[in-house]
């Protein structure tokens, strides 16, 4: 039996079949006590992949203006995957966090700043000691405005890296969001339920310059 190289993206023909039944989702976010699925009319949604989603979700729920956060899977082929399937490298999904936010309190540009400054966006199919395509850096955009802001922020951060002497090319993927599949309940707000749990989040000491 051939082994799977988890640092390589797979094709759709090689992906696990998944299932038609969605993962059960808790009714309320355990930190904010808001709906895990509903998006109020005045709120917006952003989706980020920065490595293991446990620490990423906590980073965002701690910010002002955040209505809810959710850990999940996106960017692959397998419908309604399980955590075990994603970790196998056979779904092509990334671990990601869906952020519902109030743009009157915290802007998308501010979320992008948190994204760039709190992980290493130049590691390809890994994040620190977490190795595999599910740990890749990605921004999944939901509007043309998010796409433009994300692309412009990438250019600014790449330049800031060079000015710090880091000549690596950013590997962050910026693509329109496809289906977001909620992770199992054990993974939702994991570091609230397990305060001493693993968090692999960490930046590279570079700040995102503000938009011009």
Curated annotation (Swiss-Prot):
Q: Which family does it belong to?
A: Belongs to the MsrA Met sulfoxide reductase family.
User: Has UniProt tagged this entry with the keyword Oxidoreductase?
Assistant: yes
HAMAP family cross-referenced by the UniProt entry:
MsrA (MF_01401)
From the Swiss-Prot or TrEMBL record, give the protein name: Peptide methionine sulfoxide reductase MsrA
Its catalytic activity?
A: L-methionyl-[protein] + [thioredoxin]-disulfide + H2O = L-methionyl-(S)-S-oxide-[protein] + [thioredoxin]-dithiol; [thioredoxin]-disulfide + L-methionine + H2O = L-methionine (S)-S-oxide + [thioredoxin]-dithiol
- For region Disordered, the annotated ranges are 1-21
Active site: which residues?
A: 52
- Stated EC number for the protein is 1.8.4.11
- Encoding gene, per UniProt annotation: msrA
Q: Which GO terms describe its molecular function?
A: L-methionine-(S)-S-oxide reductase activity; peptide-methionine (S)-S-oxide reductase activity
* Bias kind Polar residues: ranges: 1-14
Q: Which UniProt keywords apply?
A: Oxidoreductase
Q: Name one GO biological process term.
A: cellular response to oxidative stress
The record's listing under InterPro entries reads: Met_Sox_Rdtase_MsrA_dom (IPR002569), Met_Sox_Rdtase_MsrA_sf (IPR036509), MsrA_MetSO_reductase (IPR050162)
Q: Which Gene3D superfamilies match?
A: Peptide methionine sulphoxide reductase MsrA
Q: What class of enzyme is it?
A: oxidoreductase
Summarizing the function annotation, the protein's role is: Has an important function as a repair enzyme for proteins that have been inactivated by oxidation. Catalyzes the reversible oxidation-reduction of methionine sulfoxide in proteins to methionine.
Q: Cellular component GO terms, alphabetically?
A: cytoplasm
């Amino acid at each position: 039996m051939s082994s799977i190289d988890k640092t390589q993206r797979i094709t759709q023909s090689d992906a696990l079949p998944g299932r038609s039944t969605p993962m059960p989702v808790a009714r309320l976010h355990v930190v904010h006590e808001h709906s895990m699925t509903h998006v109020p009319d005045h709120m917006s949604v952003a989706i980020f992949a920065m490595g293991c989603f446990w620490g990423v979700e906590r980073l965002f729920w701690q910010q002002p203006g955040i209505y809810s956060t959710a850990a999940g899977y996106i960017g692959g082929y397998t419908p309604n995957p399980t955590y075990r399937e994603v970790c196998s490298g056979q779904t092509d999904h990334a671990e990601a966090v869906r952020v519902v936010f109030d743009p009157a309190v915290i802007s998308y540009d501010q979320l992008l700043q948190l994204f760039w400054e709190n992980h290493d966006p130049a590691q390809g199919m890994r994040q620190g000691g977490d190795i595999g395509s599910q740990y890749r850096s990605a921004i999944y955009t939901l509007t043309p405005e998010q796409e433009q802001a994300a692309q412009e922020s990438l250019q600014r951060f790449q330049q800031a890296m060079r000015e710090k002497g880091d000549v690596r090319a950013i590997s962050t993927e910026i693509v329109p969001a496809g289906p977001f599949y909620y992770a199992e309940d054990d993974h939702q707000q994991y570091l609230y339920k397990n305060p001493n749990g693993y968090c692999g989040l960490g930046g590279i000491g570079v700040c995102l310059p503000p938009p011009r």
